[in-house]
Amino acid sequence: MLGEFRQFIARGNVMDLAVGVIIGGAFATITGSLTEDVIMPLVGALFGGVDFSNRFILLGSVPDGMSATDYAALKEAGVAMIGYGAFVTAVINFLILAFIIFLLVRWVNKVVRKPEADASPAGPSEVDLLTEIRDELRRK
């Protein structure tokens, strides 16, 4: 049983998957930072300095002594709200990650593409075969 498990783990697909998951996790951190630290501030600047990470719609009442403008504090206090700014950030992060993975898969497919098989000489056509059969039958 241990030998079978070793063979299973040593197969290329399992190791490739493990490496892909680890690299994917690290890459998600990079794209998250790109989204939050570079792209979203630019988007916010285009919309007049709006900070999307702090955009939300209150659904419940704000506890006494709390400001109704701090998303993180309200979320920590358990106030019912829709944090659409965080959602927009997550969607942009996903789109960036999906596009980069698309480019990576496209590049790998070009690199790994198998060379086309050499055109082997074509065999006789149907007409040639039928003519040969006809001639053979005439000889009999």
From Swiss-Prot:
The protein's assembly and partners: Homopentamer.
Regions crossing the membrane: 14-34, 85-105
GO cellular component terms listed in the entry, alphabetical order: plasma membrane
Source organism per UniProt: Sphingopyxis alaskensis (strain DSM 13593 / LMG 18877 / RB2256) (Sphingomonas alaskensis)
Functional summary from the UniProt entry: Channel that opens in response to stretch forces in the membrane lipid bilayer. May participate in the regulation of osmotic pressure changes within the cell.
UniProt cross-references to InterPro entries, sorted A to Z: Mechanosensitive_channel_CS, MS_channel, MSC/AndL, MscL_channel
Keywords linked to the UniProt accession: Cell inner membrane, Cell membrane, Ion channel, Ion transport, Membrane, Transmembrane, Transmembrane helix, Transport
NCBIfam families: mscL, PRK13952.1
Protein name, UniProt field: Large-conductance mechanosensitive channel
Compartments, record wording: Cell inner membrane
Listed GO MF terms: mechanosensitive monoatomic ion channel activity
Membrane topology according to the record: Multi-pass membrane protein
UniProt xrefs under SUPFAM superfamilies: Gated mechanosensitive channel
PROSITE patterns: MSCL
Family: Belongs to the MscL family.
